[in-house]
């Protein structure tokens, strides 16, 4: 996809084409010759960490079913999904904000634009450059971005949906 090629060419970032992932997932649902490993929805898929707002961060095991339920919950709250949508993943990769929104994008066939570390100016630039439509931030991230004097220097009109969570 054009956005992915532009990101790879200009920023030296690895690009994962989630449209290809989405197409492959769709193909797998109809491929009768495919032998899948024997796992249940209750089995652990990954471990994330809480934000630590009530003390120290804690490891949380998420099952495959948790990931599907997270996807369905986000889908019901996010108006623009599927091919054509562009998600900004700015959250930490060890927490549900980063991992969850990434999984959400893959399951939906969206383009995911990934940020290695939180950089509010880079977030504004990415929204403008890649026409980000969806983003998920921790409240402190939103506070920092909104307080920037430079926020008015960027075209953020593509942004249609902002979700937040992870701290009070």
Give the role of each language-model region.
Residues 53, 109, 166:
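Conserved G/P- and acidic residue-centered "switch" motifs that form tight phosphate/ATP-binding loops
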């Amino acid at each position: 996809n054009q956005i992915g090629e532009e990101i790879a060419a200009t920023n030296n970032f690895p690009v994962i084409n989630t449209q290809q992932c989405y197409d492959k997932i769709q193909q797998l649902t109809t491929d009768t010759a495919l032998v899948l490993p024997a796992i249940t929805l209750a089995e652990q898929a990954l471990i994330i960490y809480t934000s630590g707002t009530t003390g120290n961060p804690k490891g949380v095991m998420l099952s495959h079913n948790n990931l599907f339920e997270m996807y369905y919950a986000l889908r019901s709250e996010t108006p623009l999904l599927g091919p054509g949508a562009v998600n900004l993943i700015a959250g930490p990769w060890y927490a549900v904000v980063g991992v969850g929104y990434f999984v959400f994008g893959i399951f939906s066939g969206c383009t995911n634009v990934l940020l290695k570390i939180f950089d509010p100016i880079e977030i504004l630039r990415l929204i403008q450059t890649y026409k980000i439509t969806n983003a998920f931030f921790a409240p402190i991230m939103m506070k920092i971005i909104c307080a920037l004097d430079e926020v008015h220097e960027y075209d953020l009109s593509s942004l249609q949906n902002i979700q937040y969570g992870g701290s009070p």
